[in-house]
């Protein structure tokens, strides 16, 4: 017994599968979905349950063409009243009742309606309605035409599909027939596929028939005009009700205001009236406001399908799954065609769309402000056109144009020289001034500038005194006596820390002493260009007299142009002879004031503290004569006395303030270092915050330890101090990398020619005093072209470290006569690049000095022809050049001589020889009457009978 599936039963009955499934469940059948299968008897039972609502298929078939004929007749007739269609329908007592019946009754097949139409009589009410003329329903006509076209396309498509299936079947039959050895299994597979395709085709046809039935069912008509009229009437009624309520509220407010005015006192009436008036205004504003129109209810019903012949769920039951949604372009076009559509606004508002911008008024152009030209312009070399334009407030293009008219091609980023800038300013009528560049890293300018110190603020400052002399002559004892006397005067603490300098007070005035090894430290500072000493105390022992180091100290003081006070020490000894010391010093240029000189002499005994007060008074007297002044109001400048590295404090420097006032936290540049004064201590080891002129202090806070003799200066801020310190360190490094060329006898002429020297500085050391005097007198007599020999220092004894230091400071060389330098001096001379000349014959020293001084004059050379030769044959050698075979006819041809090539009495070439040979041997010269071969450097055009003239350049001796 065969079975049927529920969806097949639904197709036969023309019902939806879910209705059949629901009816089967009502009948008590155990079914799960439309794919469930039932027996034929059960299927007949389910079909019988639908019989009262379903029309028989046999009666529907002959009625279908009749309906189409009637529709065609309706289309062909001219616009009839719409009631004519209703005559064919079953009569109803009223039109509204008819609409309700259509809504309430379930949708029946169209065939049943078609059969019922001719059977129903026309009632008199319908005739009454037909008398009213109605407009033609164009929408219904369009739908009818669309249905007919869909039916025709469907029939054509079905025919084409049948033909295609027949062709495919024949093709498959032919293919299978060609295979003789095909098995039964393949035949069964083919048959199954064919059956499957037939079943799919059958289901498609059934779906199409079902769609046709649904489309033929008449949809209930909706009168949109009546709906709109009813909605509008409802809105008007709502507006009238709201207006009436607001009007009543307004009247009630007015009545309440009137009653309140009658009840209340005059003072209260005014306040209450204001409140009620405000309420009345609010109510009036509400009355005047137009009520918002209610938007019509949105029709949420499903829109009618664009293609009635195509079901949305057509492909849901296929094997490939549901079909993807296609983009509906018709809806996009509908949006574009709407009146208030905004789809193209972005395109219209694009920047380059000229159609939009045609009617727009152009924005007014902002006028440039006119700037007057400045009267003065301060410029620097290398300024660009853009910088000049910004300074004078003009466009760079304008300046470029002016430069072009002046014949200068320039761009706005091109640098201009000072002359061009001045010409440009003349064209504009502006006075141009060149800006004076100030080197911020140059500390020396503070020491030489006249405008740095304020003349009105100058005050007297303490003198700075350096004690010099031979070590055994009592220098150390004198320093100790001065210190002990200071402690004895009651200054508590004494000198607890050695910082290189200290101060004492005499008669209410301060004196600063530098506690340094006299001449050595003095010369080191002199070599660095530092001169901090105001007065020199030269200590000479009365029993020993003038010693070599005493003479050196005298020369150092004279080189620094510092006044000398002679302290004749050890006068308490039995063998003391001060008069002899005065005479010996007079021989070396130190004359006493009693003898008509300018040096003060004081006889003291440092051991027994004798005449120490007189020595200090003499120092103050000399300082008063010098009129030592300083300005304490400016930023501090001075010199480094000594420096060291401390484990706990870092770099510690002892400074001597020469001008201005040094404060704690001042940004400072010391030599090639920089920093900020973090802490400051005086010579007693006490912390101070301020240090005036001629005050020695020890400071911390530097990034590195400076060199003794370096200058220091206080800057405005730490930023400028850092920049100056870094720039000075950079310059020092570059200077160190460059080879420093010292003066020697060979390059003396070049140095003098460059204008670096105006005299020759010499230090003379000899074995005996007579040799020193003779050599000094002989050298000073040499006078060539105004060049003078300056004897910086002359003494008896070996060449020591002090001599090398003095030579390095004075840029001099040392002449040693019958003496030798010590190992330490030789090592220092090599390190400082100081030249030492050693001689044993005096006239050779004089000749060497004369030759060095004559070298200052421009050398004169004279040409001297040494020989002539004639070219007899030429040989051209590849990769070598032309070789000329020659014979010397006069004199000789030397390898180091220059040659001229003379042809027909005309000099063709002048140059040097590349090679000279006699046969195959290289020779230095070829003499008269001999033959040889030569090559000229850089010249190969040698020909026969050319004359080769050999010559040399000889310097004319003076």
Swiss-Prot record:
Region annotation Disordered: where it falls in the sequence: 50-224, 288-374
GO molecular function: GTP binding; GTPase activity; translation initiation factor activity
Subcellular location: Cytoplasm
Location of region: G2: 494-498
Region G5, annotated ranges: 605-607
Compositionally biased region (Low complexity): 50-67, 157-169, 337-346
Residues binding GTP: 469-476, 515-519, 569-572
Location of the region described as G4 in the Swiss-Prot/TrEMBL record: 569-572
Biased composition (Basic and acidic residues): 68-89, 96-118, 138-153, 185-195, 290-323, 365-374
Cellular component terms per the entry's GO annotation: cytosol
Keywords attached to this entry: Cytoplasm, GTP-binding, Initiation factor, Nucleotide-binding, Protein biosynthesis
Region (G1): 469-476
Domain tr-type G: 460-627
Residue ranges of coiled coil: none
Residue ranges of the region described as G3: 515-518
Major subcellular site: cytoplasm
Top-level taxon of origin: Bacteria
HAMAP family xref list: IF_2_B
Function of the molecule: One of the essential components for the initiation of protein synthesis. Protects formylmethionyl-tRNA from spontaneous hydrolysis and promotes its binding to the 30S ribosomal subunits. Also involved in the hydrolysis of GTP during the formation of the 70S ribosomal complex.
Similarity comment: Belongs to the TRAFAC class translation factor GTPase superfamily. Classic translation factor GTPase family. IF-2 subfamily.
Protein name: Translation initiation factor IF-2
């Amino acid at each position: 017994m065969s079975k049927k599936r529920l969806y097949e039963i639904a197709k036969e009955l023309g019902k939806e599968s879910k209705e059949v499934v629901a009816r089967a469940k009502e009948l008590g059948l155990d079914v799960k979905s439309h794919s469930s299968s039932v027996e034929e008897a059960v299927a007949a039972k389910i079909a019988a349950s639908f019989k009262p609502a379903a029309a028989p298929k046999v009666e529907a078939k002959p009625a279908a063409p009749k309906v189409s004929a009637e529709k065609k007749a309706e289309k062909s007739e001219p616009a009839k009243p719409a009631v004519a269609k209703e005559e064919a329908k079953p009569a109803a007592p009223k039109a509204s009742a008819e609409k309700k019946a259509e809504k309430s009754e379930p949708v029946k097949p169209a065939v049943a309606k078609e059969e019922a139409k001719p059977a129903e009589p026309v009632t008199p009410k319908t005739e009454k309605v037909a008398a009213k003329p109605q407009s033609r329903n164009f929408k219904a006509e369009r739908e009818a035409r669309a249905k007919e076209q869909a039916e025709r396309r469907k029939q054509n498509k079905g025919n084409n599909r049948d033909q295609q299936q027949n062709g495919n079947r024949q093709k498959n039959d032919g293919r299978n027939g060609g295979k003789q050895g095909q098995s039964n299994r393949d035949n069964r597979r083919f048959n199954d596929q064919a059956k499957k395709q037939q079943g799919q085709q059958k289901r498609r046809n059934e779906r199409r028939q079902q769609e046709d039935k649904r489309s033929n069912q008449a949809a209930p008509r909706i009168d949109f005009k009546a709906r709109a009229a009813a909605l509008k009437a409802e809105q008007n009624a709502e507006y009238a009700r709201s207006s009436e309520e607001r009007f009543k509220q307004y009247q009630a407010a007015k009545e309440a205001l009137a009653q309140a005015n009658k009840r209340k006192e005059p003072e209260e009436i005014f306040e209450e009236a204001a409140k009620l008036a405000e309420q009345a205004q609010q109510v009036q504003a509400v009355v005047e406001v137009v009520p918002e129109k209610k938007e019509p209810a949105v029709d949420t019903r499903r829109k009618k399908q664009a293609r009635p012949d195509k079901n949305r769920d057509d492909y849901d039951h296929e094997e490939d799954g549901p079909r993807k949604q296609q983009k509906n372009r018709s809806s996009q076009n509908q949006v574009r065609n709407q009146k208030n559509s905004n789809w193209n606004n972005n395109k219209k508002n694009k920047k380059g769309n000229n159609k939009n911008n045609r009617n727009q008024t152009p924005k007014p152009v902002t006028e440039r402000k006119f700037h007057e030209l400045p009267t003065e312009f301060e410029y620097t070399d290398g300024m660009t056109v853009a910088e000049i334009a910004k300074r004078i407030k003009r466009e760079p293009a304008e300046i470029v144009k002016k430069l072009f008219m002046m014949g200068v091609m320039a761009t706005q980023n091109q640098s201009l020289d000072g002359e061009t800038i001045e010409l440009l300013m003349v064209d504009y009528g502006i006075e141009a001034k060149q800006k004076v560049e100030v080197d911020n890293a140059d500390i020396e300018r503070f020491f030489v500038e006249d405008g740095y110190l304020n003349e009105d603020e100058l005050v007297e400052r303490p003198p700075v005194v350096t004690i010099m002399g031979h070590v055994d002559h009592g220098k150390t004892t004198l320093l100790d006596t001065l210190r002990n006397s200071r402690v004895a005067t009651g200054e508590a603490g004494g000198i607890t820390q050695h910082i290189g300098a200290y101060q004492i007070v005499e008669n209410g005035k301060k004196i600063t002493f530098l506690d340094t090894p006299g001449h050595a430290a003095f010369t080191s500072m002199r070599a660095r260009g530092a001169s901090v000493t105001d007065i020199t105390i030269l200590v000479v022992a009365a029993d020993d007299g003038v010693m070599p180091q005493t003479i050196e100290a005298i020369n150092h003081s004279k080189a620094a142009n510092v006044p000398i006070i002679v302290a004749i020490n050890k006068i308490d000894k039995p063998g003391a002879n001060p008069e002899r010391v005065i005479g010996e010093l007079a021989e070396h240029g130190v004359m006493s004031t009693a003898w008509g000189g300018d040096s003060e002499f004081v006889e003291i005994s440092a051991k027994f503290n004798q005449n120490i007060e007189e020595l200090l008074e003499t120092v103050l007297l000399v300082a008063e004569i010098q009129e030592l002044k300083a300005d304490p109001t400016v930023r501090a400048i001075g010199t480094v006395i000594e420096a060291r590295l401390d484990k706990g404090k870092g770099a510690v420097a002892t400074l001597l303030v020469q001008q201005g006032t040094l404060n704690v936290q001042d940004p400072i540049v010391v030599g090639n270092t920089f920093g900020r004064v973090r802490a400051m201590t005086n010579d007693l080891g006490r912390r101070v915050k301020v240090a005036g002129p001629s005050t020695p202090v020890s400071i911390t806070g530097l990034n590195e330890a400076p060199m003794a003799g370096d200058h220091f200066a206080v800057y405005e801020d730490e930023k400028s101090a850092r920049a100056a310190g870094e720039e000075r360190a950079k310059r020092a490094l570059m200077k160190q990398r460059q080879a420093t060329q010292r003066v020697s006898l060979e390059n003396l002429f070049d140095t003098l020619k460059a204008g670096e020297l105006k005299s020759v500085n010499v230090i003379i050391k000899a074995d005996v005093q007579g040799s020193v005097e003779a050599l000094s007198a002989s050298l000073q007599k040499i006078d060539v072209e105004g060049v003078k020999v300056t004897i910086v220092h002359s003494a008896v004894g070996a060449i020591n470290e002090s001599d090398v230091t003095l030579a390095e400071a004075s840029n001099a060389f040392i002449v040693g006569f019958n003496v030798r330098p010590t190992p330490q001096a030789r090592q220092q001379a090599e390190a400082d690049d100081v030249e030492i000349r050693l001689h044993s014959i005096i006239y050779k020293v004089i000749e060497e000095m004369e030759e060095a001084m004559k070298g200052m004059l421009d050398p004169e050379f004279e040409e001297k022809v040494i020989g002539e030769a004639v070219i007899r044959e030429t040989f051209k050698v590849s990769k070598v050049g032309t070789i000329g075979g020659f014979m010397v006819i006069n004199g000789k041809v030397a390898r180091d001589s220059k040659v001229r090539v003379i042809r027909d009495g005309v000099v063709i070439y002048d140059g040097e020889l590349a090679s000279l040979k006699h046969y195959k041997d290289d020779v230095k010269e070829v003499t008269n009457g001999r033959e040889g071969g030569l090559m000229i450097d850089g010249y190969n055009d040698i020909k026969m009978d050319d004359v080769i003239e050999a010559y040399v350049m000889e310097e004319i001796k003076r």
